[in-house]
Structures are given as C-alpha cells and as structure tokens.
Amino acid sequence: MGGKELSEEQVASMREAFSLFDTDGDGRIAPSELGVLMRSLGGNPTQAQLRDIAAQEKLTAPFDFPRFLDLMRAHLRPEPFDRPLRDAFRVLDKDASGTVSVADLRHVLTSIGEKLEPHEFDEWIREVDVAPDGTIRYDDFIRRIVAK
C-alpha cells in the first residue's frame, strides 16, 4: 500500500491510541471508531472523508492494529503544524485583513509566554516586508519562520 512511512514514535502513539479504543481487548476496533481514533492522533477527517476511506478500503468489519497502521499510512493527514501560529495571528488581526501591527506583534512576542528578547524580535521582523502603515502580512511572516 502506498503512503508515507511512520516513525517509531508515531507507531508507538498509534499503538497506544488503538489499545485505548480497543475497549473489549480483542485486538480489533469497529470501523465507526476510525474518525475518533484519527482525531486523537492529530488528524481532522470530515465525515465525508471517513465515508470515502471506509468505501475505498472496504471497511465493513472490525480491523486489527496492522490494518490500522496501513490505514494511517494511506490516509492520516495531520493538522498543519503552523495552525496554532495562524490562530494566534488571527487574534491580533482584528479586522481580518491578513495583516498585524508590528507594534502589537512586538508587544505580544516580547512580553507573553516564552518571551523573545527585543533584539530577537528585531532579527525576525527584518526578514519580512513591513508596510508603510507599520503592518506585516502574517502569511509571509509564518512562511519565513516555518522555512527556517
């Protein structure tokens, strides 16, 4: 079956999740549990996607862990790891314009949570285009940060 290789860590997480959902301990899980199981592992399949997977994979009976790994290799689409970053920017983007004020961003990143030093922020901000009104497009900022 095509798809991506899974790391030992991913397989261990999947084994743990699988065993939690295998409530009767028979080593098998009902097809109806697949969506919850995938979501517990960072996937975010829609009901339509789950129906497609079930049809494509002919999932009509409970399946075991090796079959589950095959399904995950083929179908697990993890949430983009930059989503929390995008969500944080959206909070600062009060008018939903796709831009944030450099001053607001500086304040948040140098004073909340794992604080950046002001000189670290200055290094980051030098890598993006700041508009004349003092804002940046956060998609550009995220793209540059994620690329590093």
Swiss-Prot record:
GO terms for cellular component: cytoplasm. Residues 9-44, 80-115, 116-148 form the EF-hand domain. GO terms for molecular function: calcium ion binding; enzyme regulator activity. InterPro entries: CALM/Myosin/TropC-like (IPR050230), EF-hand-dom_pair (IPR011992), EF_Hand_1_Ca_BS (IPR018247), EF_hand_dom (IPR002048). Ca(2+) 1 binds at residues 22, 24, 26, 28, 33. The keyword Ribosomal protein does not apply. It comes from the Eukaryota. Ca(2+) 2 binds at residues 93, 95, 97, 99, 104. PROSITE patterns: EF_HAND_1 (PS00018), EF_HAND_2 (PS50222). Keywords: Calcium, Metal-binding, Repeat. Potential calcium sensor. PANTHER family: CALMODULIN LIKE 3, MYOSIN LIGHT CHAIN 1, 3. This is Probable calcium-binding protein CML7. It comes from Oryza sativa subsp. japonica (Rice). The lineage of its organism: Eukaryota, Viridiplantae, Streptophyta, Embryophyta, Tracheophyta. The gene is CML7.
